[in-house]
Every structure is written in structure tokens, then in C-alpha cells.
Amino acid sequence: MDIQELVRAQRTYFDTGATRPYAFRLLQLKKLQQALRDNEQLLEQAMMQDFRKAPMEVYMCETGMVLEELRFHLKHLKGWMRERAVPTPLAQFPSKSFVSPEPYGVALIISPWNYPVQLCLSPLVGAISGGNCAVVKPSAYAPATSASIAKLIRETFDARYIAAVEGGRAENSALLAQRFDTIFFTGSVAVGKVVMEAAAKH
């Protein structure tokens, strides 16, 4: 499906409420955790090809950090999802007030070339924990790593829930033309301004 259809399909899926329950979020985090472990060697080979990074450096700066992020989210997710009581204004007595965490909806994650695994998958962990759908756009400047991340995501998740889009500027422009509920971007100030301008239109 093209990018517009993909975002529309994710929004439709989000609107079903399927991503909201604790059990669903927990399962998806565990699936990502297992997929990352299963594909660790593939990612190491890809990063050797793109950056000449040794496996130990890949683990210390990339995959290991994402696995730690996953462990932390799996431990704390239930607490983060709880309603939190807050003070009630006197004018509203005798009612009670609560803050209830809610998902944004459909997220776009645009990652850079220099830490392409960590800065792609760590934001994805947050998107999943938050009960969102997500489109991940790995950097075209790390082609082997981008292909490996896309493979991991496609083999792990339904595209209506989590999808990967590969490509360069044309794909970035097509993604930014869509309406997303939140965008996680890591990169230069110049490109950040382009992302902010595109997001402001929605």
C-alpha cells in the first residue's frame, strides 16, 4: 500500500481501540524484545557494512540500549497507565479529579544515520507503551541497517499497527504530507525546521 493508504489504515486500526489495553501493549513490547534478540546478529552485520562498527560497540550503543529500554518499560508500564488523582478545585466540591494517560494516535518516527537502531527503536518502544500506532522511517544514509530494521518490523508487526517505510527525500516528503498525531524526529536543525513546518499544517 502507498504511504497515504498506510497512514489511513493505521488511523482506522487505532480507532478500533485495539492498541489501548495493557495486555496488548505488554505483548507487543515482548514481541519487539524477542525480535531484537533474534535479529541482533543481522543488525551487527548491517552496521559493520554501513559503519565498520564492531559487534561490541553495536551492543553498547545500539541494541543493548534498546533492550534496556524495553526492560524498563516492561517493568513500569502498568504503573504508567494508572489514573492519577489530582487536587480538585473548591468550586467543584464534592467531585474528585483524575489525570488519565491517553495515547496520541498515529506516530511518525524519523531516525538519523549515526545511531540508526537506538534512535529508531527506542522511540518505537515509547510509542508502543503509549498505546499508539507508528510509522518508522529509518535513515537512507545507512542502507543496510535501514533494510534490517524494516525487515525486523515487517516480520514482527501488522503494518496497520507498526510499519516501516524505506527511502530518501521523496518518501520523507510523502510522510510529512500526512497528518500524524505526534512526530519523533532526530536530526539536524535545518531538517527539523522542515519537519516542524510540515507538522504545523496539521
What is the meaning of each model-derived region?
Residues V106, T156-H202:
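Conserved NAD(P)+-binding/catalytic subdomain of aldehyde/semialdehyde dehydrogenases
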Residues T88-T156, F185, H202:
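Conserved small-residue-rich beta-alpha loop and adjacent elements
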Residues R25, L70, G131, I162, ...:
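Residue-level signal for inorganic ion chemistry
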Residues R11-D15, M48, R52, M56, ...:
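A broad detector of the eukaryotic-type serine/threonine protein kinase catalytic domain
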Residues D38, L42, M65, Y115, ...:
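Short alpha-helical
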Residues Q45, Q118, P143-A147, S173, ...:
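Alpha-helical elements of the RecA-like P-loop NTPase motor core of helicases
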Residues M1-F98:
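N-terminal Rossmann-like NAD(P)+-binding subdomain of aldehyde/semialdehyde dehydrogenases
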